[in-house]
Amino acid sequence: MGNAEYARDLGRALVGAVLFALPLFMTMEMWQLGFTADRGRLVTLFVVMLPMLIALSYFAGFERAFGLLDHVLDAFAAVAIAAASGAVVLLLIGVLSPAQPLQEIIGKIAIVTFPGAIGALLADKQLEHKREGDDDDDDGDDETHEQEEIERSYFARLFLMTIGALFVALNVAPTEEMILIAFQISPWQSLALALISLTALHALLFWAEFEEDEERMRGDGSMFSVFVRYTCAGYALCALASLFLLWIFGRTENTGLAELTEFIVVLAFPAVLGAGLAQRVVAERRG
């Protein structure tokens, strides 16, 4: 890859990082959490985030990678781009200032880094960039075919659902509106919301699927089996991702089981939308 092409890919990654982190830039609760969030939990978020970004680089890196080291470097580059762009944007809109304590500055940047890093990695696909030589290299064709096979595998689908769920839920979890909704809905409304979330996830996973993927999924078993293995498993991952983020942002403290369940159900609703759409974004080049 030439320097000009690499610079162009970095530019796309920068745009993707800002675009994906934009909701958090404009969220007042995020500004407060940068100061109040437990630093140990933010470190935990980074520890969980990094291997997921390395794995995501395999599916959607912003440059062509050929081995584990390349994917690791890709992930670190995405984190660096997301952190740098996040710091600049927060500084421009007055959320950061040199007078603030260093811990507060680091906390605010850390919160926007995860969605920004995802955006940096997905920018190549979102901006429809096609690298030169991808169609002319037979070895590249074999590699692409192998990657497509992996992307269609069961665990790859679950992984991509988890990434999408974490990204969307992270943009909602810090807000007070999410807590307010959970308090004002009844148990029956919570149950209805959970069922609607399951239905939405199932529709997103199977609606407008490519014919080969439909045949592959149906070949895995009956439609009930597919519903359990994909949709129910996906919703469970969305719920776990929601619980993890609620814990990261201190929403689980002094909270009863019933209230916590409602928090999870409410946060899982946007999470399932991200889970269902994540595979569509990564799988676009197969169309």
Whereabouts are the PLM-identified features?
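Alpha-helical transmembrane segments of multi-pass integral membrane proteins
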Residues: 11-23, 78-87, 111-124, 152-175, ...
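N-terminal signal-anchor module of multipass membrane proteins
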Residues: 1-51
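C-terminal ends of transmembrane helices
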Residues: 1-2, 55-67, 125-128, 207-215, ...
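Membrane-interface helix-loop-helix junctions at boundaries between adjacent transmembrane segments
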Residues: 66-158, 282-287
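Interfacial helix-loop-helix linkers and transmembrane-helix boundary segments
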Residues: 32-38, 60-74, 98-103, 182, ...
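Transmembrane helical segments that form the transport core of multi-pass membrane transport proteins
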Residues: 168-221
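Alpha-helical transmembrane segments and their membrane-interface junctions
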Residues: 87-101, 165-181, 239-258
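Alpha-helical transmembrane segments
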Residues: 36-49, 103-118, 184-200, 266
